[in-house]
């Protein structure tokens, strides 16, 4: 999973470029590119995603985010933050049009395409578009249920995830859609340490450094992160699966110097304790 932060306090790799690089050096890993869609030109983005997906043999997922937490990013690229919802929804519609084999034209409020398609097209004709939301608002749940291929849930508790899955299921059925078509993925930040209090402190300080602020609410770490011993972390991860997550994306929440060690501990101790395994190969890429 690669995030999208045009302006950030730490080095941050651009998602499309990174996926393109990794596509040429791997053969099984699925890539989730988190993209703040209102900041992107739909035509250019559709082209970049299609080529990355083609080169990776169908291993790309586009996770669209609304953005808005950092208005300066919008101002920096000449976009009015008030337009973000309209641009977000139109970007999804325009990209799906461009991946369609049938020629035609697209005319929206912000994007007009006189005609033409993207070639080469995505490996399987289209790329899954997930919505990266906390699922707080009625409108965001409605979008997930009606126009998305999946929900990438970040910064939610397991309880909130379960509630969101129930709400999305109801809305999808009301819309006449099979809820099983909507893949649910939870993003959980993990830090393994035998001292739970230290784990809370380290992760809170790490987020404060990342956001460039003096302090970070430790209650956020307690609520959303998997912290403590391997068994404690495993129990927290398992709670997301029990709440309805089909996949859990694990992000080591630690200073860079500890990253490799945390990955080893998570892989060797936490995942087995949680009864989880590394993600399988997508069916279309086998």
Regions found by a protein language model. Give the residues of each.
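Active-site-adjacent structural elements that line small-molecule/cofactor binding pockets in enzymes
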Residues: 1-286
